[in-house]
């Protein structure tokens, strides 16, 4: 048995098209033009690529994008002052500060400075808290993108055993909340988890985001499981791989996301959806 591939590129293109149509409809209705402000501090090459991809998605959707590229030497006060200006700007619907920030900056303080209704990354504690109490407002992009993928492929988490490997604030924790919201029975595994292989082997739905190449072995996976690999790692030979051992996993799983082309495109599509949602919040 070879698993069906979950095609994030295909699903993301449909979602981006839907956003583009909604943006065009807003313009016909004389509503203000959705606008995303993206802040990049320093010259990290990977971050520059991510920012460029986000700008390209904005162009596809007809969303206005503002770019702020600040030097590595930018102080905490200067960065917070920029966030304050963007918070106060009624033309700006979404604010995204690209992570990671240079080490001398306090990223948590910066994320908490963004107005929750403009927090299109969904990282503000207010938005994570809303998700926890079943009242989501701005949902973290990668976990929400995973849920969109599951829905697109007819996978209902209700009553299923879902296992999340990795407990980061960006993926693992909010992913567990999203799955809980969908009424799955959720287990979160982390660095202190004992018998990780047993936990993984019990998963009907497995989501892995630890940032370690091929961390989860194919033989651990329950036959017929759905495997969502959030990891993206560059190997010494320049190739990309996920956190799951793909070649062996696809022989046991029923469905699996490839890397690249699985979760990554969904993160950006969800960012566009969140920006559109933020614009609708600001219509009132």
Curated annotation (Swiss-Prot):
Binding site for NADP(+): 166-168, 191, 232
UniProt GO molecular function: methenyltetrahydrofolate cyclohydrolase activity; methylenetetrahydrofolate dehydrogenase (NADP+) activity
Known catalytic reactions: (6R)-5,10-methylene-5,6,7,8-tetrahydrofolate + NADP(+) = (6R)-5,10-methenyltetrahydrofolate + NADPH; (6R)-5,10-methenyltetrahydrofolate + H2O = (6R)-10-formyltetrahydrofolate + H(+)
Record key words, sorted: Amino-acid biosynthesis, Histidine biosynthesis, Hydrolase, Methionine biosynthesis, Multifunctional enzyme, NADP, One-carbon metabolism, Oxidoreductase, Purine biosynthesis
Superkingdom in the source lineage: Bacteria
Pathway the protein takes part in: One-carbon metabolism; tetrahydrofolate interconversion
UniProt-listed Pfam families: THF_DHG_CYH, THF_DHG_CYH_C
GO BP field: L-histidine biosynthetic process; methionine biosynthetic process; purine nucleotide biosynthetic process; tetrahydrofolate interconversion
EC number: 1.5.1.5, 3.5.4.9
CDD domains in the record: NAD_bind_m-THF_DH_Cyclohyd
PROSITE patterns xref list: THF_DHG_CYH_1 (PS00766), THF_DHG_CYH_2 (PS00767)
GO terms for cellular component: cytosol
Function: Catalyzes the oxidation of 5,10-methylenetetrahydrofolate to 5,10-methenyltetrahydrofolate and then the hydrolysis of 5,10-methenyltetrahydrofolate to 10-formyltetrahydrofolate.
Family: Belongs to the tetrahydrofolate dehydrogenase/cyclohydrolase family.
PANTHER family membership: C-1-TETRAHYDROFOLATE SYNTHASE, CYTOPLASMIC (PTHR48099:SF5), C-1-TETRAHYDROFOLATE SYNTHASE, CYTOPLASMIC-RELATED (PTHR48099)
Record note on quaternary structure: Homodimer.
Designated name of the protein: Bifunctional protein FolD
Source organism of the structure: Neisseria meningitidis serogroup B (strain ATCC BAA-335 / MC58)
């Amino acid at each position: 048995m070879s698993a069906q591939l979950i095609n994030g590129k295909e699903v993301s293109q449909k979602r981006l098209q839907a956003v583009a149509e909604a943006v065009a409809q807003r313009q016909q209705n004389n509503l203000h033009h959705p606008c995303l402000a993206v802040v990049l501090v320093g010259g990290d090459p990977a971050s520059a690529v991510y920012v460029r991809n986000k700008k390209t998605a904005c162009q596809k959707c007809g969303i206005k994008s503002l770019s702020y590229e600040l030097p590595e030497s930018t102080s905490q006060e200067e960065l917070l002052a920029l966030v304050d200006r963007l918070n106060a700007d009624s033309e700006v619907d979404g604010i995204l500060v690209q992570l990671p920030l240079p080490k001398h900056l306090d990223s948590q303080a910066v994320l908490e400075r963004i107005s929750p209704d403009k927090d299109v990354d969904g990282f503000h504690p207010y938005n994570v808290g809303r998700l926890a109490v079943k009242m989501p407002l701005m949902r973290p992009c990668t976990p929400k993108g995973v849920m969109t993928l599951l829905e697109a492929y007819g996978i209902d988490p209700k009553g299923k055993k879902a296992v999340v490997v990795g407990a980061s604030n960006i993926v693992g924790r909010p992913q567990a909340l999203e799955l809980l919201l969908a009424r799955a029975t959720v287990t979160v595994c982390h660095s202190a988890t004992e018998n990780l292989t047993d936990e993984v082997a019990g998963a009907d739905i497995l989501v892995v985001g630890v940032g370690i190449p091929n961390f989860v072995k194919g033989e651990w996976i329950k036959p017929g499981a759905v495997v969502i690999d959030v990891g993206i790692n560059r190997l010494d030979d320049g190739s990309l791989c996920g956190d799951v051992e793909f070649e062996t996993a696809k022989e046991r799983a029923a469905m699996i996301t490839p890397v690249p082309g699985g979760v990554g495109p969904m993160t950006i599509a969800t960012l566009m959806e969140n920006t559109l949602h933020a614009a609708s919040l600001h219509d009132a």
